[in-house]
Amino acid sequence: EYDGEPNGLKIHKDGRIFVADHRHGIMLVDEKRGTIEPVIIGPSKQRFKGVNDLIFAANGDLYFTDQGSTGLHDPTGCVYRYTVAGKLECLLDTIPSPNGLVFNVRETELFVAVTRANAVWRVPLDESGPLTKVGLFIQLFCPGPDGLAVDADGNVVVTHPGMGYVWL
């Protein structure tokens, strides 16, 4: 029996199905056995605040947001990378409610919907070291950016389900 709170879902290039579950962390669905099991439940034997969305890089690394109940009052949401080697890395840990995330076309930048700050952040990615120069991509006039996508031309698409808007 599954008692989770699924938020996001992605299919890995090898066909495995991963779920970002607010309650249980990153889960793996086994269609053949009819099971769903935890893959990552938290950093250093702690539990996540409440994972929200996930995306795979071309090399197979998994990036995901840990939103929980964070916000401007508690800007401790995180973006994690789980490498193909099995290493969990916290890339950012000062985000007021990280939500959806997407790479640019070349995977040199990660865009993160920061729901409670009404913004989308741009995160330059560098495999050789820590993140630097994280910045504001767009400041919205209303609360709650959620899902993100990038089209073939590199345009970032931002959804706001509460208002029924999609921005390109």
Model-derived features with residue positions:
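Short loop/turn segments that connect beta-strands within beta-propeller blades
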Residues: 30-34, 82-86, 124-129
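Non-catalytic, surface-exposed connector residues within folded enzymatic/regulatory domains
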Residues: 20, 29-30, 73, 114, ...
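Beta-rich, blade/repeat-based domains predominating
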Residues: 1-25, 44-62, 70, 76-78, ...
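Anionic-ligand binding region
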Residues: 111-137, 141-144, 148
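Conserved phosphate-binding/catalytic loop of the ribokinase/pfkB sugar-kinase fold
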Residues: 41
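Residue-level hotspots at or immediately adjacent to binding/recognition sites across diverse folds
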Residues: 65
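A short loop-to-beta-strand structural motif that recurs across blades of beta-propeller domains
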Residues: 25-27, 77-80, 119-121, 165-167
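Predominantly a core beta-strand signature of beta-propeller blades
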Residues: 33-38, 86-90, 133-136
